A protein has these predicted regions:
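Extracytoplasmic
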Residues: 1-145
Length: 145
């Protein structure tokens, strides 16, 4: 995957559910959800603490990435996107602290410097924040050199 081209977050989103047993309702397992925005199309929504997206075989090249940029929307401050290589606790590239944008469908591009992203790796976008409330919505992301 080319991280220097715009990557739509929802094209790699996953969600799952599990059933506890026959006579009880479904319980949702951790995962991301999608919805349609009138302004930008499909997005990853209702992101909560410890949800994550994994992207396989991201080729950062020899010179590597210097910056991560994401198109986000949020009514509140307090969410973040932690960037890691190869596993949930792998090498840390950087963390984008998501600032309030004015609403769940008010979109802004926000960015953060990154380091250590060279070669080909699996990339983890791990969402962080306090409590169980939704943190922000994510439309697309990209890296720059």
């Amino acid at each position: 995957l080319d991280p220097y081209a715009r990557v739509e977050a929802e094209t790699i989103a996953w969600t799952s559910r599990i059933k506890r047993d026959r006579d009880r309702p479904f319980q949702w397992a951790p995962g991301v959800k999608t919805t349609r925005s009138d302004k930008v199309g499909m997005v990853v929504t209702r992101i909560t603490d410890l949800d994550y997206i994994k992207v396989n075989r991201v080729d950062f090249g020899r010179s590597g990435a210097k910056r991560f940029k994401a198109n986000v929307a949020s009514e509140t401050d307090g969410g973040a996107i932690e960037l890691r290589l190869d596993s949930l606790d792998g090498p840390h590239l950087g963390t984008l602290t998501v600032s309030k944008t004015g609403g769940w469908d008010e979109w802004q591009q926000q960015s953060v410097p990154v380091s250590g992203a060279t070669g080909t790796h699996d990339l983890y976008l791990i969402f962080r924040g306090a409590g169980d409330a939704p943190l922000f919505n994510l439309d697309h992301w990209t890296f720059s050199r």
